[in-house]
Swiss-Prot record:
One of its GO terms (cellular component) is intermediate filament. It comes from the Eukaryota. Induction: Expression in skin and hair follicle is regulated by HOXC13 and by GATA3. Belongs to the KRTAP type 19 family. In the hair cortex, hair keratin intermediate filaments are embedded in an interfilamentous matrix, consisting of hair keratin-associated proteins (KRTAP), which are essential for the formation of a rigid and resistant hair shaft through their extensive disulfide bond cross-linking with abundant cysteine residues of hair keratins. The matrix proteins include the high-sulfur and high-glycine-tyrosine keratins. This is Keratin-associated protein 19-9b. It comes from Mus musculus (Mouse). Residues 6-52 are annotated as: 12 X 2 AA repeats of G-[YCGS]. InterPro entries: KRTAP_type8/19/20/21/22. The keyword Repeat applies. Keywords: Keratin, Repeat. Interacts with hair keratins.
Length: 58
């Protein structure tokens, strides 16, 4: 659970990287780094479900 929140809320702190996914288009890297580094890393994060997909990918 900590991984999900770490990405979802972590991306939020980096610039809405995981909040919804729209922000992930530009701040996808922030979302992945908020989780650990492999939360999509610009591949899954910039999708429409940035937070969910990057968490699932990790």
């Amino acid at each position: 659970m900590s991984y999900y929140y770490g990405n979802y809320y972590g991306g939020l702190g980096y610039g809405l990287g995981g909040f919804g996914g729209f922000g992930g288009l530009g701040y996808g890297y922030g979302s992945s780094y908020g989780l650990g580094g492999y939360g999509g890393y610009g591949y899954f994060s910039p999708s429409f479900y940035g937070g969910y997909l990057s968490s699932g990918f990790y």
